[in-house]
Amino acid sequence: MFDLQIPPDPVAEPPPVVVSAPAWDLTVGLISATVQLDQRNADAPTRRVGTGFLIDAPRPDGQPRTVLVTAHHVLDGMRGPEARIGWRYERPEGGWRFAPEPLQIRDPAGEPLWTRHPERDIAVMEVLAPPDFARAAIPLGWLADANALDAWQVGPGDELLTLGYPHGYSANTAGFPILRVGRVASWPLTPIEAFPTFLLDFPVFPGNSGGPVFWTPSARKAPGAFQPDHPFIAGVLTSEVRPGDAPLGIGIVAHAAYVREAIARLDAPAGP
């Protein structure tokens, strides 16, 4: 005679794990949409370098349009009719290829082909981008408007990220921009009519001008502080604080709302 073992209750299969698609990463998105701008100086074996980034800004009739954004002084300081824009192409076998191409920035009379914000160091111009870059252009809605920094409680000490080409250097031979981080160093930030720029605590070098300044969840805020519900572009790096010959290691950022205003001027009727 023997006892029968009672089999254990069947173990329920765990519910399938639902893996959601990763959220779109503005950091990688902006890296893909940021380009080097340069022009060789006519009187020296050097070149003038700046940074630009692409915005997807459809025309009023809905037709697609890719707009290059940079600091006005970057293009204004390039006296020749052509600059170079640093496109990058992914190789089918892997890796990337840096392939700068000419960018017409002045007409035959020497007049600028870009549109300048009337008061801020912001320039925009429509560009014919390669398909991969046109797809990488950042949607216009990701540019912070005049009320965004208040709504998202961005304040002094908060981290923001920026992309650029300091001294003309890139992150690698493929021409990708260098990612850096700084903290908001001024207060108040708004209203932007009274405070059109704000300070960022990080060293600025030639070649950084025109780069995007942005927030993503990877940037640190004070513990317990309000977290914005999605990433955004806060502004454009335009210059540095330099009271004399010695820089202070502090950047000056123009609010992204002025980029919106400059893009709107592309669609304004031509003057008489």
Predicted regions and their residues:
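C-terminal tail/extension regions appended to the core domain(s) of diverse proteins
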Residues: F2-V19, V241-P272
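Serine endopeptidase catalytic core focused on the charge-relay Asp
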Residues: S32-V35, Q39, R48-V49, M78-T197, ...
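A conserved glycine-rich beta-strand in the N-terminal activation segment of trypsin-fold
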Residues: R40-V67, I250
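Short consensus segments that form the blades of beta-propeller domains
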Residues: D43, N172-F176, A225-Q227
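A residue-level detector for short acidic-glycine micro-motifs
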Residues: L54-D56, S186-P188, W215, T238
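Cytochrome P450 catalytic-core helices
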Residues: T70
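Catalytic nucleophile loop of clan PA
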Residues: L199-V236
